[in-house]
Amino acid sequence: MAKTALKVKAARKPKFAVRGYTRCQRCGRPKAVYRKFGLCRICLREMAHRGELPGVTKSSW
């Protein structure tokens, strides 16, 4: 319940612009969120490994 409430709270427009922050759309994690995907690093990695993100490939050099 607490995580659901925090997701709703983060979705609201803050009174002051600097108070806004991103949350992972999948798990609700507040830190390490990639804005382009709207996912945290953990969810992004899992989904990329499963091939659920088109155009995202594992890089090697």
Swiss-Prot record:
GO biological process: translation
Record-listed Zn(2+) binding positions: 24, 27, 40, 43
Tagged with keyword Protein transport: no
Single Gene Ontology MF annotation: rRNA binding
Co-factor(s): Zn(2+)
UniProt GO cellular component terms: cytoplasm; small ribosomal subunit
Keyword annotations of the record: Metal-binding, Ribonucleoprotein, Ribosomal protein, RNA-binding, rRNA-binding, Zinc
PROSITE patterns: RIBOSOMAL_S14 (PS00527)
Quaternary structure and partners: Part of the 30S ribosomal subunit. Contacts proteins S3 and S10.
Physiological role: Binds 16S rRNA, required for the assembly of 30S particles and may also be responsible for determining the conformation of the 16S rRNA at the A site.
Name under which the protein is recorded: Small ribosomal subunit protein uS14
Organism whose genome encodes this protein: Nocardioides sp. (strain ATCC BAA-499 / JS614)
Protein encoded by which gene: rpsZ
